[in-house]
Curated annotation (Swiss-Prot):
Location of region: Disordered: 401-422
Organism: Bacillus subtilis (strain 168)
InterPro entries for the chain: MFS, MFS_dom, MFS_Efflux_Transporters, MFS_trans_sf, Tet-R_TetA/multi-R_MdtG-like
Subcellular location: Cell membrane
Keyword Transmembrane helix: yes
GO molecular function: transmembrane transporter activity
Keyword Transmembrane helix: yes
Organism lineage: Bacteria, Bacillati, Bacillota, Bacilli, Bacillales
Principal subcellular localisation of the protein: membrane
TM region positions: 12-32, 49-69, 76-96, 169-189, 218-238, 257-277, 287-307, 309-329, 344-364, 374-394
Entry protein name: Uncharacterized MFS-type transporter YitG
Gene label: yitG
Compositional bias ranges of the Basic and acidic residues kind: 401-410
Gene3D superfamilies reported for this sequence: MFS general substrate transporter like domains
Amino acid sequence: MESSKQNNGMTIVAIGSIPLILTLGNSMLIPILPKMKSELHLSQFQVSLVITVFSLIAAFAIPIVGYLADRFSRKVIIIPCLILYGAGGLLAGFAAGFFDNAYPWVMAGRALQGIGAAGTGPIAMALTGDLFKGAQESKVLGLVEASNGMGKVLSPIIGSLIALLVWYGAFFAFPVFCIISIVLTWIFIKEKKKEKEPPPIGQYAKGLLSVFKHEGRWLFTAYLAGATCLFTLFGILFYLSDVLEKTYDTDGVKKGLILAIPLLVMCVTSYTTGSKIGQKQSLMKKLIVLGLAFMTVSYAALSFIENLVLFISVLVLSSIGSGLVLPCVNSFITGAVGKERRGFVTSLYGSVRFLGVAIGPPIFGRLMQWSRPGMFLSIAGLTLVVGILVMMLIHVKQNNEETKEKEDPKMAGNRLQPAEER
């Protein structure tokens, strides 16, 4: 029994290491972007593409990788993707440090990392749904999101520390972390054997169409809520990284620590939320709406705040909001379909999240040039609209009614569940 618990714990550690690697891909580079801009003589738009290209490539690769993960196995996809991720970091690092025309090669390395990233976080979500059930699944998904958040917390600090040695050193850290995750995944993740052969691609596609026909309205709303959190998060980090150096003359480890504050709050909130929500879908919806309301209030208030301490204090409210939204959205989406198509549906969610990350820095870069108050009021408007959409389009039964559904299947019409179970 003790051995089983220990193995279970190491399985969770192994799964958690996968999205942690994923978050390093962008967050670890954010503190060094101003230095990269000056060293490689780049424009603000060019340096923002270092984040955007990685995320865009990942977004388009994820649905393909998700299908392959459903077709074969999660581990068969995750491990090669982690190898590719590390190799892309090596290419970008050598290019930045030793190539004359470094920028195109850095971008090529980031593109390779994007393809590798496609097989990390989203597949880890599907794997969690495969291995854990019920309230334990929600708790582990909360841990996965917390691991994602912890990666965001640690990576600006790690990036800043490595940059004290050499600014492009962060690229060489990627393969080191990837090797650790590969070893953990190989040893501790034991997938269950498939009970039946995967369906032909035509039948698979038909099943997906059925899922989106029945669940599409709320599913895409949930996708949008998750993407909005990541869009605003990375946009704000991009803005804050630039402002800390230019306005407040803050760089190095101190800058990394400041960037880590809102991320740490989001991480703690994500873990707490995931451990409390269980399978209470009505509670999940309320927390998503509350989280988006917190984000709206925070961003609207930031348009009037100049003082750095007060700015970070108010920004923390938006981090609490993101920490409420993301674990609930994860649980909704992971439970939306059965195992056979879970990889694709969670991967599509991963694509949308990556698109949010991809467009955050360039859009915030443009908004920064336009108007600072206008930038914050615009994103406050976005989070408000998304919150209203969640209230209108995601329908769940109350908790006491969910119990009755077990006795009366006719009541299950609007409850979120796999389409194939209907």
